Amino acid sequence: MNAPRGRGFNSQFYVPDALPLRHREFAHRGDFRLIGFPVAAPDTPPCPFQKRFPSQLVRDDAFYMSLAYNQAIDAWREDEVPIGAVIVSAGEVIGSAHNRVEGAQDPTAHAEMLAITQAASRLGGWRLEWATIYVTKEPCPMCSGALVMSRVKRVCYAVRDPKMGCLGGAANLNDLPRSNHHFELTQGGVLEDECRDLLQAFFRLKRMEPGENGGVDLG
């Protein structure tokens, strides 16, 4: 029997349809089904970058951006655009995610959106008034708007996006004079080179693939 192929599913195992009570039952059961779970997309080029392991003693911007960077590497390994986000409140990580647009086939499944949803669930409310989000690339229009609406206290991003960024790159939603919320904004300077190198390497490899012409203009 041929294993089903699908994006991100390169590990398949036969498992019983019903949980056996004893080893003997497991050995003699004939009704097995094939399942798969994502490990790495089958055609994804290996990620040449390593995760960061910052010291736990200093919980500064570089520490939390390192966690976001690690999320971005996880995205690469799933053949997603390598962008990661981490949300922190009172020194505690309350949201952590990376892009899942391709795997979920959901255009809203950006790292920031998923992290915001996690954080709101963790806090039991949608207002993230005391939270800081660290994200490896400047948020797009959708994510920038969501950050305004979530009342986040501060946004710190690593790489400016002059093409689609909406917090200083192509536009700045945080500067709208009639908006009912404005947050503190740190634009670049925190693991900026590392996050830019990761993104550029990903799209460089993608452009080498047949039929691929995507990318993000990072200046």
Predicted regions and their residues:
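Short beta-strand scaffold segments in enzyme catalytic cores
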Residues: 83-88
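A cytosolic small-molecule/anion-sensing beta-strand core signal
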Residues: 89-90, 117
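Short hydrophobic alpha-helical segments enriched in small aliphatic residues
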Residues: 3, 15-18, 24-29
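A short, polar/charged loop-to-alpha-helix boundary motif
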Residues: 103-113
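Immediate flanking context of iron-sulfur cluster ligation sites
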Residues: 125-138
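Short beta->alpha transition motifs characteristic of CBS
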Residues: 94-101
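Zinc-dependent deaminase
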Residues: 11-14, 32-75, 139-219
